[in-house]
């Protein structure tokens, strides 16, 4: 109640998710001081007989390829994460049966284009066959966000700066 005037969320759209972020957000460069970040989210589903354990086991393989191609990621603030759905009854992802969200974050849209090009040219042929053994993601829906950090526990007085966007 203390902060209900600051930020409120609709109850029906909230989702219970566990998340794993294998790469630190500052590993490939810092995010802008404004708090801005660009992100792409993919809706993913386990293949029959597969589970969260398979998805979690894949993350070190993907992470290793990211680090092996670090020249292509430098300066982009690239990091990624998987949000694993707990299938809460009122969550917005329940209707679609989404098992997990694959999320990529960068410091700009141009940086995302760059990292996607690195993936397509250097990583896809290695990783995609392994990924499709346990999951598929919708290719017709990519949630794109121009986001801002609203709270930084290490900088209590942090305020996002929307002036340049």
Predicted region positions:
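Short S/T/G/P-rich N-terminal loop/turn motif that feeds into the first structured element of a domain
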Residues: 1-128, 133-165
